[in-house]
């Protein structure tokens, strides 16, 4: 005869194994390295004032540096600064609130993009959007002497690129999202299809409205004080939105396959 199955009193029933909980926000290595780079570079504020100002003049983006009518004026950094400042300005910040604000916006969107692109593509993308922001600032401030600094053109680019896939079913702004890696690698919508998505359009309207009215992230430091370089944000944003596909390693979905419904 078989013995009846052993029964446990309710008070000594074995507890089921706890389900693994995914952290709300996990940072990929590429994004962590980028944020650490910003933090390390920001230690320049500990330098003597003259030397700190020199770093801004050499690595900040100064539109007047490209004014051909100023042949007799030499800017710090020489001819090389005409090249590297298209990117290096984005690694400089005025103070902790400036760098903290940019990092805060970078965390959700940059995290998804770094997982999707991988380290090399991610850093190349950040450099490209920084350069696009500098070009937009140069086009609208041709004779400005105030150096522009701040990562917000690149941050804006990550936000624009991320909305190409953020609302797709299973992605990180979808109600049916999977784990962080899977959410970052859903097929992106074709641009024309994304621009028909009401949520994408709402995001675009809010983003452009906030930037035009208030300005966020990048600043220009001059004798007249600090001003927001919102044109650089728009340059980085448009570059991220339009050039996303050049960096995206995930095969594109057909318009009917990339269903944006959550």
Predicted regions and their residues:
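A detector for small-residue-rich transmembrane helices and their helix-helix packing motifs
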Residues: 2-262
